[in-house]
A protein has these predicted regions:
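N-terminal leader/targeting segments
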Residues: 1-96, 482, 523-540
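Internal transmembrane alpha-helical bundles of multi-pass membrane proteins
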Residues: 5, 28, 302-542, 549-554
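Aromatic-rich juxtamembrane segments at the membrane interface
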Residues: 5-17, 26, 181-312, 317-318, ...
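Hydrophobic alpha-helical transmembrane segments
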Residues: 51-53, 258-269, 510-523
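Hydrophobic alpha-helical transmembrane segments in integral membrane proteins
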Residues: 82-104, 544-555
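Short, surface-exposed secondary-structure edge patches
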Residues: 96-103, 146-151, 201
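OB-fold single-stranded nucleic acid-binding module
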Residues: 113-196
């Protein structure tokens, strides 16, 4: 059966094709950003009146005139999402403002996060009670030496210490946004106390078991890297090593996201195809994949990047089962809504911004960059034509089709990968400069090595850790011997080579200049219903404006 397409159809005379879910997500973001400036910078609420022309603008530019009921409904939906973002973030801010410092007191809670440093153990407590009163927030505490080896995830603690409210300023909100979204508003110092019990939590139990097995079965550095790749926990990686990995441009392999979830998704599809499950009903297959992906997302604490990738994979798989071709931009919009509707402050986290910037870069630029590669390949073949075999000549004469050559298939795979990688790096470049102060010169080269490597090893690594979790702890070393050796060999590269030597550093960029940069890239895409000459003219003008802005900022 032929697949149906649910993307918007081109509209004659309109600038772009309207995607309702994508624009709903955009207006949700607008509402969150407006509330941020309203609450932290006292921006007047009267500016909300600008919502009317803002919502009308994309509708009139992308929808045909005359369908007033449809246009009115879409207008209401966009305004509604904007207001949801505004009030949703406002609720989070109110929750923070209603918390106060307690000073010296007794408090209890359940350990939901835990990270071990050299001389301390940091825990996050949920279900918090202070002096017997329930609190609608979480607390960070650094445990005393007496509790270092006694506490695990989901343990219940009764402690005494000095509890203070964490100060969160607008200027440093991006660094605090992750904890803000988790409602971690309090910090306890000079802590003493005891463990009082344990409450079972499936996700925390699986997370703790995986960490324990990995630490028991592998050497220190390979274990830290394995925890990062599988669980997104980079706390155990030695600081110098992690900094070198960052400058190599591949730190994203430790932020569990589309690369990891996509590998797990592909493995699930392989299981369905190669086992008796292939004969089961499509609904059962979908629920099997959904349960596996959601279970993994839960073990990773439902981080924004994991939720985004999970939603996109499930939407794509559902579309395949019901024979409807899905739209990547719509899926991205849906994933953003699923995250921001519950925790609007996630918008300001670096991980969320980098994750979605990379995906939007792929959606907008991968195809145009691939077309540039194809034009280059055509030009090369013009001067260096391929010699056709007798079978190919015979097929041409008989007007038959031949399967592509191995060299052609290799070119397609390599060009597709390079186009995707370049597109993601182009869109994330301003964020890397803004938050980290550099852009790696090694990124493209090392991504060509490590992205396929992680894609290939991830499922194997997950299977081996799962098997080790099901077996006695004493056998973990034997089960995890292979990944331990592989990581030890791979990490030698980052011990030997200093990747900080080739990076663009010391360059400043502002939010306004970043927007001009993004506008320039968007005009070079095929998402506009404009003549190519006009798109390139507008894109060139934005490039010039970007260059002028960067020179002005960095002189």
């Amino acid at each position: 059966m032929k697949e149906k397409r649910i993307t918007a159809q081109p509209n004659e005379g309109k600038l772009f094709n309207f995607r309702l879910v994508l624009f709903a997500a955009i207006f949700l973001v607008v509402g969150i950003v407006f509330c941020f400036y309203h609450r932290f910078y006292s921006l007047s609420s009267l500016w909300l009146l600008c919502l009317i022309p803002m919502a009308a603008f994309p509708i009139f530019l992308s929808l045909p005139f005359g369908k007033w009921k449809e246009m009115g409904l879409i207008f209401v939906i966009l305004c509604g999402f904007c207001l949801m973002g505004f009030f949703g973030f406002g609720v989070e801010v109110n929750r923070y403002e209603n918390v106060s410092s307690f000073g010296e007191c007794y408090f209890s809670g359940r350990v939901v996060e835990m990270s071990k440093g050299t001389n301390s153990v940091k825990v996050v407590l949920d279900d918090l009670r202070i002096d017997g009163e329930e609190q609608n927030c979480k607390l960070v505490a650094y445990l005393p030496t007496s509790l270092h080896d006694k506490v695990t995830l989901s343990d219940e603690l009764f402690l005494h210490g000095n509890v203070e409210k964490r100060e969160i300023s607008a200027e440093k909100f991006a660094r605090a946004a992750k904890d803000f979204g988790k409602r971690i508003f309090l910090t306890a110092n000079d802590v003493e106390g005891e463990k009082t019990g344990h409450r079972f939590d499936l996700f925390l139990f699986l997370n703790a078991r995986a960490k324990k097995v990995i630490d028991e079965g592998m050497d220190k550095t390979p274990a830290a890297v394995t925890r990062a790749v599988l669980l997104g926990n980079t706390a155990g990686i030695e600081e110098g090593l992690y900094e070198n990995i960052r400058y190599g441009g591949i730190a994203h392999i430790f932020a569990v996201s589309g690369l990891h979830v996509g590998s797990l998704f592909a493995f699930c599809l392989l299981l369905l195809k190669k086992t008796p499950m292939r004969r089961s009903h499509g609904t059962l297959q979908f629920f099997f994949v959904a349960i596996i992906l959601l279970l993994y997302a839960g073990i990773c604490a439902f981080s924004a990047s994991v939720v985004r990738a999970t939603v996109i994979c499930l939407i794509a798989y559902l579309g395949k089962l019901i024979q409807v071709k899905t739209d990547f931009l719509q899926s991205l919009g849906g994933a953003a809504i699923c995250i921001l509707i519950f925790t609007p402050s996630t918008l300001f986290t670096v991980g969320f911004q980098l994750s979605f910037a990379a995906c939007f870069g792929i959606a907008f630029l991968a195809k145009p960059i691939g077309q540039v590669f194809d034009e280059g390949a055509k030009l090369y073949r013009k001067y260096f034509p391929m010699k056709l075999t007798e079978a190919e000549l015979q097929a041409i004469e008989n007007e038959d089709t031949m399967p592509p050559r191995i060299s052609t298939r290799i070119y397609r795979a390599v060009s597709s990968f390079l186009a995707t990688s370049l597109a993601a790096q182009i869109f994330t470049a301003p964020l890397l400069l803004q938050y980290f102060g550099y852009i790696s010169g090694w990124a493209l080269f090392l991504n060509c090595i490590f992205v396929p490597f992680i894609s290939a090893i991830f499922s194997l690594l997950l299977i081996l850790v799962t098997v080790a979790c099901l077996m006695p702890l004493e056998l973990a070393t034997a089960v995890l011997y292979l990944p331990n050796v592989i990581w030890s060999a791979v990490l030698l590269l980052f011990e030997v080579v200093d990747f900080t030597s080739f990076a663009l550093e010391g360059v400043s960029i502002s939010a306004g200049v970043s927007l001009v940069y993004i506008a320039a890239t968007l005009f070079f895409t095929d998402k506009w219903n404009l003549k190519k000459s006009l798109r390139f003219t507008l894109g060139g003008a934005c490039v010039l404006a970007f260059a002028i802005g960067m020179v002005a900022l960095n002189l």
